[in-house]
């Protein structure tokens, strides 16, 4: 059974709690709104049509892999994991007051993490109604699980020992980000990269007219233009994957004050480092942060979110470009039976996947960039402004993952329209002014650039115009023949070779 649950917020259950701004002067309309607001369905079981966020509403099914990792329940699960890892490590530290745990107790504790369920999460939420403190609720829940085992019950005060809430939170954040990055974000991005690499190879030899400043320019190939994006994405992906995810467990202001008050001679820094860097499940598998205030500085998060945002910016650029290629007819989109493109124009086949991706990438970047700017800033030894922002990490990543899925779907619908590509090339003979003047320069023909400018700039140029000019040039006959054989479609340089390299 999965240990996560739905994340759909519940409307107020009392009819008179309908917001005044939604009330109508009409009794019938008002009663309808009250009826809509009086659902008694538990918040975690609401249908998606009642979700406030489209990530848990319209797009919920597309984010089923991310939800268990970045939801509040996922956050609770990681907190339990951190508390248990710290507790077990303390039992192995050699303290006379806390003997090593038996194998049975260790297995029991590890199973609390492994089998963490929706019911467990709801039990913690119930405790939080009394404590009004989410981390303390986790601590009390763990202690409640010790009641049936005297060995653990006697050691209950070592749960959350010497820890500040942020020791548990920051490591949980890092664990969430690690799993989300490695198990969801990067695999979704990899699918886009793989599909685009496949297209770059398939279309490596398909000539295409370039446009710089929106005007005709030296031809390329479709595959080479896709390869450009693939290389950018590969570089961006490697940066995301390489960022170390940090964790600190050093107390209320980062100095091990409480720890040393209990055992002054113990090497708490080395102990903390071991818990943080030992691979899961015995440790946390993170990178140790030795210097902090109450909170981990969040610099690694800023770096991670900036790296994801830069990747998204590359994909926004590509989404707009491929949208344009569809618009001018270089690509058509495969039809899907039953789909409708417009409520009034039956002929429409819109590039909705690329538009959806562009919009969601923009939303992701707005959040990611806010977090990368805000999170490294905290007043003195800490303030709470980071807490509410951090709860939106999953939202930011959710919009990014959603966009990657949309791009992958959109790319899979594309079919190349070679006739449109060829038509554009055949109407742009002026682009051969570049190779002609370059060969003229090789043979020291005076004013080569200026002569071609006079013939081509702002004019409609035909093959015959250029061929007449070529024949009149004082260059070797072999060079004339080479230039005469050239067409806009053949003048692509090493584009095909470059496309195949990626």
Q: In which residue ranges do the predicted regions lie?
A:
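Glycine-rich cofactor/substrate-binding loops
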Residues: 37-77, 128-132, 329-331, 342-502
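A helix-coil-helix interface module used to build multimeric assemblies
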Residues: 37-259, 263-277, 341, 354-356, ...
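Short amphipathic alpha-helical segments with heptad-repeat character
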Residues: 178-186, 190-193, 197, 227-230, ...
């Amino acid at each position: 059974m999965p240990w996560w649950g739905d994340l759909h917020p519940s409307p107020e259950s009392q009819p008179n709690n309908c917001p005044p701004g939604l009330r109508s002067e009409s009794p019938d309309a008002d009663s309808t709104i009250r009826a809509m607001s009086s659902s008694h369905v538990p918040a975690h079981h609401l249908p998606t049509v009642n979700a406030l966020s489209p990530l848990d509403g319209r797009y919920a099914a597309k984010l089923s892999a991310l939800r268990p990792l970045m939801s509040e329940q996922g956050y609770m699960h990681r907190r339990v994991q951190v508390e248990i890892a710290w507790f077990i490590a303390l039992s192995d530290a050699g303290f006379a007051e806390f003997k090593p745990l038996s194998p049975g107790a260790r297995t029991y504790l590890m199973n609390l993490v492994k089998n963490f369920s929706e019911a467990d999460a709801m039990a913690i939420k119930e405790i939080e109604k009394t404590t009004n403190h989410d981390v303390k609720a986790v601590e009390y829940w763990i202690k409640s699980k010790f009641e049936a085992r005297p060995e653990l019950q006697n050691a209950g005060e070592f749960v959350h020992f010497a820890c500040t809430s942020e020791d548990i939170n920051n490591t949980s954040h890092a664990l969430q980000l690690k799993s989300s990055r490695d198990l969801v974000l990067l695999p979704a991005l990899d699918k886009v990269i793989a599909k685009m690499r496949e297209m770059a190879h398939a279309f490596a030899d398909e000539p295409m007219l370039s446009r710089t400043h929106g005007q005709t320019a030296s031809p390329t190939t479709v595959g080479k233009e896709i390869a450009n994006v693939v290389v950018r994405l590969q570089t961006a992906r490697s940066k995301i994957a390489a960022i170390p995810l940090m964790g600190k467990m050093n107390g209320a202001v980062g100095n091990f004050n409480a720890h040393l008050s209990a055992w002054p001679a113990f090497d708490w820094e080395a102990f903390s480092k071991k818990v943080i860097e030992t691979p899961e499940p015995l440790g946390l598998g993170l990178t140790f942060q030795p210097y902090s205030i109450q909170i981990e500085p969040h610099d690694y998060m800023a770096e991670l979110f900036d790296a994801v945002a830069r990747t998204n910016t590359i994909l926004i650029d590509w989404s707009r470009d491929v949208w344009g290629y569809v618009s001018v007819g270089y690509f058509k989109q495969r039809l899907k039976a039953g789909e409708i493109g417009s409520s009034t124009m039956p002929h429409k086949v819109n590039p909705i996947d690329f538009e959806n991706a562009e919009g969601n990438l923009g939303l992701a970047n707005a959040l990611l960039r806010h977090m990368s700017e805000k999170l490294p800033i905290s007043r003195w030894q800490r303030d709470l402004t980071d807490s509410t922002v951090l709860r939106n990490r999953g939202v930011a990543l959710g919009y990014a993952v959603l966009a990657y899925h949309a791009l992958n779907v959109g790319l899979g619908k594309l079919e190349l329209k070679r006739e449109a590509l060829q038509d554009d090339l055949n109407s742009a003979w002026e682009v051969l002014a570049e190779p002609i003047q370059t060969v003229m320069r090789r043979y020291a023909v005076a004013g080569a650039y200026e002569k071609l400018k006079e013939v081509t700039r702002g004019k409609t140029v035909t093959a015959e115009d250029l061929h007449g000019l070529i024949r009149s040039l004082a260059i070797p006959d072999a060079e004339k023949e080479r230039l005469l054989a050239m067409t806009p479609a053949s003048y692509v340089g090493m584009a095909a070779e470059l496309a195949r390299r990626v």
